Amino acid sequence: MILCQDVAKLRELVANFKKENKSIGLVPTMGALHEGHASLINASAKENDITIVSVFVNPTQFGPNEDYEAYPRTLENDCIVAQNAGADVVFAPKNKDLYPNEDMTWVEVTGDITKVLCGRTRPIHFRGVTTVVSKLFNLSRADRAYFGLKDAQQTEVLRRMVDDLFFNVELRIMPIVREADGLAKSSRNTYLSPEERKSALILSKSLRLAKEAFTNGQRDVEAILNLVKDTIQSEKISQIDYVEMYKLPGLKPVGNKIEGRVLLALAVKFGTTRLIDNVILEDK
């Protein structure tokens, strides 16, 4: 496996892969790799000749007073995880490599899709995501790019960007990977105290109860949202940011009844750590 920390070097590697007609899979990450990331890398390795994993804590997607400085940076371990999962290249640029100028070009998806859910409290977040991912698409010339469904809003925003800007890349959205006790894998789980970690299990439990209610015929949006909120609030240290439902694709409003394919998403704080999770409710 090659560790590449230079834009020019990555371009040279990619040009050679393309000359050899090799298909390229891209797995964009912010590092602190865990089994969720490994599953994305593994999927890419199975479906492509070459897998490039980017490791970059992207400053432009963090707002003021968010956890940019505290975000775990573990490049040495990330390389081990990536290699074991089947990566061929780890691309770990510095900030100045991807953002060489103070005055810069932004790639921004507008409309409600970036204003609801996480966009409501993190207004600059998705602009940072789409800007850095568009740079990574251009540099990697990837045929396929791999993202986890845990960041469901992000995947919808990126789908819009790919469609609108005619990126010649296939988005592969992979299932949420969970701990044995149900907690969704996240690099931010490392921030949780033992008490917070135990309380955070209420997230997957609340979504499981919602899925059961839906499976048993409940289609009333308010009833399911209240079920999830009440379940989460049974954990005293939980602070709900949002529990909401939107139609898929495109995150459109749902109305009073669940019809078609719907995203039930939540964001909840335990102490200072904000966790997200979701489930898709769909009539089969």
Can you describe what each PLM-predicted range is?
Residues 2-237, 250, 280:
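Nucleotidyltransferase catalytic core that binds NTPs
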Residues 227-284:
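Phosphate/ribose-recognition catalytic cores of enzymes acting on nucleotide-derived substrates
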